[in-house]
């Protein structure tokens, strides 16, 4: 399939069965509510021990729903690979198992990303530069206050320290963003491999996932990512503008649209992978 066909099919797919999308929407909203509830209630355990239990229960429920949703995403990816136009049904056991496998893949890629970013942080010495900047500011304030140095010398010293910190921070952020983009694409390929082979071992083969991306076409994959980002950015901009005038209506549309886009992206992953399946 070409890029236009993939984008069109993916973003129309959730609307092909509104009843199943409604179930997915309710699950997504419930998960969000329980995450927010658990996050807000749990810290209050400092004042009332019962809040620890309540917050923990909320978060566990959110985790269970998250497993189920992730497993359903796997079925949507599989429908794209098989070019099946029917929106998948919800199956309790299969969705939970799929969600567990997707979670393993997510943790696997998170560990790799965290390691690479940690190396980047050490290489750029961003924390060391941050500490050095704070120390330099305190030192120069002391020097100026007790007239050890002039204000000009203090400003120059602080400026150099701040500059070094900003450069190291900028490099670290750039590396983190690039790593996140690359491994997000690799993770999507691994999820597609899982949907296609039903093998977690095959899905975790990062080198084969990379080969799959090359077979699909790196340019094609990057264009799909870029188009999705553009679509989301345009919609987000429109929402931000309209929110000032119609906050309630925009909030409702946002709640409906975020799960819709999430489902469309899973379909897009499957369709892109269908070329080599």
Predicted regions: what is each one?
Residues 50-81, 162-202, 237-277:
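Selective recognition of hydrophobic, aromatic-rich stretches within alpha-helical transmembrane segments
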Residues 23-81, 98-157, 162, 172, ...:
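Short, small/hydrophobic-residue-rich motifs at membrane-helix boundaries and re-entrant hairpins
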Residues 2-33, 90-115, 183-236, 273, ...:
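Interfacial aromatic "cap" segments that immediately flank transmembrane helices
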Residues 41-45, 231-233, 240-244:
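Juxtamembrane/interface motifs at transmembrane-helix termini
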């Amino acid at each position: 399939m070409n890029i236009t066909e993939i984008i069109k099919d993916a973003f129309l797919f959730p609307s092909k069965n509104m009843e199943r999308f409604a179930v997915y929407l309710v699950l997504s909203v419930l998960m969000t509510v329980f995450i927010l509830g658990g996050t807000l209630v749990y810290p209050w355990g400092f004042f009332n021990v019962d809040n620890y239990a309540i917050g923990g229960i909320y978060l566990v429920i959110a985790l269970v729903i998250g497993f189920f949703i992730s497993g359903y995403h796997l079925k949507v990816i599989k429908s794209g690979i098989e070019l099946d136009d029917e929106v998948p049904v919800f199956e309790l056991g299969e969705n939970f198992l799929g969600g567990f496998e997707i979670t393993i893949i997510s943790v696997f890629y998170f560990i790799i990303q965290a390691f690479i970013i940690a190396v980047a942080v050490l290489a750029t010495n961003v924390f060391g530069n941050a500490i050095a900047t704070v120390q330099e500011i305190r030192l120069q304030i002391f020097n100026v206050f007790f007239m050890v140095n002039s204000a000009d010398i203090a400003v120059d010293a602080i400026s150099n320290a701040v500059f070094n910190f900003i450069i190291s921070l900028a490099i670290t952020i750039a590396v983190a963003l690039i790593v996140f983009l690359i491994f997000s694409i690799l993770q999507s390929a691994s999820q597609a491999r899982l949907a296609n082979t039903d093998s977690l071992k095959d899905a975790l083969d990062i080198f084969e996932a990379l080969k799959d991306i090359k077979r699909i076409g790196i340019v094609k994959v990057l264009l799909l990512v870029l188009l999705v980002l553009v679509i989301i950015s345009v919609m987000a901009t429109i929402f931000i503008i309209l929110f000032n005038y119609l906050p309630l209506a925009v909030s409702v549309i946002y709640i409906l649209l975020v799960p819709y886009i999430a489902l469309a992206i899973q379909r897009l992953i499957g369709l892109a992978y269908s070329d080599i399946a």
